């Protein structure tokens, strides 16, 4: 039988957009939550179906595996896709769109600041022990900050990071959209609706929406139509 999401007629959750995929990549599967790139040796970029310009939002991703050749070459965060939504790599030095991305294998945070790429090093990176764990992304557009989590805890030096250009964009009404880029890895996203990732704790946001492995931080909400109508 086909996979089915836990949406209802009155509440739909964000998924990965199958027509919003860069670099000849395979469209997401399993309810548009699973990214299959292992063995391709190329950058594969994905984007969500919902965007936000204000409020506080949470989603998480599940580390299905780790490339034996390249490690966890996975970036997660947000993008505004102002110009080139089919960019092969969201972190490309030629891509002037605004990003806020955490690189799992490098422990780096990437944004654009003015006309230059800004790289913040010293965040915790994730090694082989990360397989089977979750990375959380908490976007705070009220204060133009982002925090990244690993296995339920804030990543070292990964709290309240400035959004730089992305925050400027959302202040101007340009939508920030969930963005994930992988290289030679398979990866699963959980926006709170259907996901193939294993959920053992079934945590929801403060409005009672979403099913997450780790509870969203206080004041952060799942990307779904009910929450967007009230908060986004």
Regions found by a protein language model. Give the residues of each.
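PRY/SPRY (B30.2) beta-sandwich protein-interaction domains
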Residues: 1-232
């Amino acid at each position: 039988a086909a996979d089915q999401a836990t949406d209802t007629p009155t509440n739909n959750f964000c998924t990965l957009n199958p027509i919003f995929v860069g670099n000849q990549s395979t469209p997401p599967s399993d309810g548009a939550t699973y990214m299959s790139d292992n063995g391709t040796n190329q950058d594969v970029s994905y984007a969500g179906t919902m965007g936000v310009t204000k409020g506080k939002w949470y989603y998480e991703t599940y580390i299905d595996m780790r490339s034996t050749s390249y490690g966890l070459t996975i970036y997660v965060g947000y993008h505004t896709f102002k110009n080139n939504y089919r960019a092969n790599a969201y972190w490309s030095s030629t891509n002037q769109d605004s990003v806020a991305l955490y690189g799992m294998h490098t422990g780096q945070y990437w944004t654009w600041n003015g006309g230059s790429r800004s790289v913040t090093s010293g965040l915790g990176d994730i090694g082989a022990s990360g397989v089977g764990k979750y990375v959380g992304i908490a976007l705070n557009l009220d204060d133009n900050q982002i925090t990244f989590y690993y296995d339920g805890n804030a990543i070292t030096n990964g709290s309240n990071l400035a959004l730089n250009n992305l925050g400027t964009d959302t202040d101007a009404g340009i939508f920030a959209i969930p963005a994930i880029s992988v290289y030679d890895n398979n990866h699963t996203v959980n926006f709170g609706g259907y996901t193939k990732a294993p959920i053992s704790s079934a945590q929801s946001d403060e409005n009672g929406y979403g099913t997450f492995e780790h509870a969203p931080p206080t004041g952060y909400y799942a990307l779904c139509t009910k929450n967007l109508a009230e908060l986004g």
